[in-house]
């Protein structure tokens, strides 16, 4: 049993099990599941046919692959036999042609090497040459000289080919050496005048590794000192600033002395500030005092605002209490006049009286102003005559109910109302693709011959006509209903007027 048959049987078994499970599930369900099972069975049959075609294609692929394998295995054997026979034939034909030449004295033989060992192109060329030689030799008796010339040409061609092959082999053999020489020349040109420096570096490195010494041949100095001298002697300036050099011993001592003197001065200033509290403080103290003064000023401003507000409230309260205080003060003054005589009053009492009289006059003047102001503020308003509740509506007006479905069915929500707005304004209803244009522009386009729907959109055009006719019919029905209502109202009004006239005539007659 081959692998192809095994794969085919496995696929068939898996399909059968899957079909059996699906069939058992579909039987357990109701009528709705049966319809589903039918569609599934259709899909299953389709997949089965697809798998069959796939399996047949797979078999053809496997057959082709096996055929190619067998062919490739036998190809080498066939090529070997063919080449061997070809070499044998060429060798035999070359020897016979050489013997037939006679006069030339040269035998053109082919090497008895296998086809794999010799170059295929060279062998083909040699075979063609041998065939040409035999043809030229056996044309006629006069063709002997021609055949000899042809042989000479063939010799020259062989020599040229051999010389070219030899040159190519020499180039391949010598390519590595030539490349090496080229690299060496480049290195020489690159170093140029710096060869002395390079040699010195190499020598110095060798000395360092051999002797294990840190010093080199930089004029008896270290490498770092030598580089430092080069930097100092250099005329070019660096873009970046040099890092500051560390201070020397004398400079360090001067810095320490300055630091100690500053410390002593700060101690003396502290003592002076403690003894003389009124003396000016340092810059930092002055800054802090300024900030404190600013804070105090802001606080004082806030306090002033609060005091002003309190004074306003007190003035209002004093104005209200002045009504009662004036009457009390009048009674006190009358009592004092009766008790004391004019002769017993001293100058001090006279002065105090003058002050009191001035205060009273001011208070009365203020009270008069307030009374005038209060009279203008507290005028009695006349009550307006309230309308009867029966004549006016109370509360918000009810929202007008939109009759849903009055335009017919098969319409998008809000679509019929939008179309109805255009109908009320006696405008053309815009179609699909006409949103950016006005109704006048669309009408002008249609008059010139442009049609927005076209022959491909007949169904869409039919839907549009149906919707528009629904809206038109609904609007016409509404208009008819309004006319009927108006006519009905007119009739009722006429009847009422006739009844009133009859009643009035009867009353006048009585």
Curated annotation (Swiss-Prot):
In the record, what terms sit under GO molecular function?
chromatin binding; mRNA binding; rRNA binding; snoRNA binding; snRNA binding
Q: Where is the composition biased (Basic and acidic residues)?
A: 1-22, 40-89, 342-351, 368-383
State the residue spans of region: Disordered: 1-128, 149-220, 239-401
Q: Where is the composition biased (Low complexity)?
A: 112-123, 184-219, 274-283
Q: Where is the signal peptide?
A: none
Sequence ranges of Basic residues compositional bias:
23-39, 262-273, 292-322, 352-367
Tell me which InterPro entries the record gives: NKAP (IPR040466), NKAP_C (IPR009269)
Q: Which GO terms describe its biological process?
A: regulation of gene expression
GO annotations of cellular component type: cytoplasm; nucleus
**Its domain of life?**
Eukaryota
Q: Which family does it belong to?
A: Belongs to the NKAP family.
The protein in question is named: NKAP family protein
Organism, as annotated: Dictyostelium discoideum
Source lineage: Eukaryota, Amoebozoa, Evosea, Eumycetozoa, Dictyostelia
């Amino acid at each position: 049993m081959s692998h192809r048959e095994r794969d085919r049987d496995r696929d068939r078994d898996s399909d059968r099990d899957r079909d059996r499970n699906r069939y058992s599930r579909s039987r357990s369900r109701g009528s709705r599941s049966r319809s589903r099972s039918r569609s599934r069975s259709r899909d299953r049959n389709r997949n089965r046919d697809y798998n069959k075609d796939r399996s047949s294609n797979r078999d053809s692929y496997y057959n082709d692959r096996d055929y190619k394998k067998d062919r490739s295995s036998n190809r080498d054997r066939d090529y070997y036999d063919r080449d061997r026979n070809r070499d044998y034939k060429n060798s035999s034909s070359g020897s016979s042609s050489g013997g037939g030449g006679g006069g030339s004295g040269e035998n053109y033989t082919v090497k008895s090497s296998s086809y794999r060992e010799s170059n295929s192109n060279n062998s083909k060329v040699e075979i063609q040459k041998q065939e040409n030689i035999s043809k030229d030799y056996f044309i006629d008796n006069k063709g002997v000289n021609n055949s000899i010339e042809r042989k000479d040409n063939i010799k020259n061609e062989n020599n040229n080919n051999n010389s070219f092959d030899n040159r190519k082999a020499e180039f391949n053999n010598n390519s590595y050496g030539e490349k090496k020489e080229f690299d060496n020349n480049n290195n020489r040109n690159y170093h140029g005048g710096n060869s002395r420096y390079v040699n010195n570096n190499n020598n110095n490195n060798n000395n360092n590794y051999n002797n294990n010494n840190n010093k080199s041949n930089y004029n008896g100095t270290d490498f770092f000192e030598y580089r430092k001298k080069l930097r100092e002697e250099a005329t070019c300036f660096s873009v970046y600033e040099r890092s500051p050099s560390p201070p020397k011993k004398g400079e360090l001592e001067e810095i320490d002395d300055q630091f100690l003197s500053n410390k002593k001065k700060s101690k003396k200033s502290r003592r002076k500030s403690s003894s003389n509290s009124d003396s000016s403080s340092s810059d930092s103290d002055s800054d802090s005092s300024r900030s404190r003064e600013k804070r105090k000023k802001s606080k004082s401003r806030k306090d002033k605002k609060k005091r002003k507000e309190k004074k306003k409230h007190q003035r209002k309260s004093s104005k209200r209490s002045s009504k009662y205080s004036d009457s009390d003060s009048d009674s006190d003054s009358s009592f004092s006049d009766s008790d004391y005589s004019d002769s017993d009053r001293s100058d001090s009492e006279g002065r105090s009286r003058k002050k009191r009289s001035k205060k009273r006059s001011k208070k009365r003047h203020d009270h008069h102003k307030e009374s005038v102001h209060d009279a203008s503020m507290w005028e009695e308003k006349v009550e307006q005559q309230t309308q009867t509740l029966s004549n006016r509506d109370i509360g918000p007006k009810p929202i007008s109910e939109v009759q849903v479905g009055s335009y017919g069915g098969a319409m998008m929500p809000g679509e019929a109302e939008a179309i109805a707005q255009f109908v009320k304004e006696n405008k053309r209803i815009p179609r699909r693709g006409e949103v950016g244009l006005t109704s006048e522009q669309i009408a002008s386009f249609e008059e010139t011959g442009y049609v927005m729907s076209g022959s491909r959109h007949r169904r869409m055009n039919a839907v549009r006509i149906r919707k528009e006719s629904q809206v038109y019919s609904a609007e016409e029905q509404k208009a008819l209903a309004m006319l009927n209502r108006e006519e009905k109202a007119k009739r009722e009004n006429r009847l009422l007027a006739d009844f009133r006239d009859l009643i009035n005539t009867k009353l006048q007659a009585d």
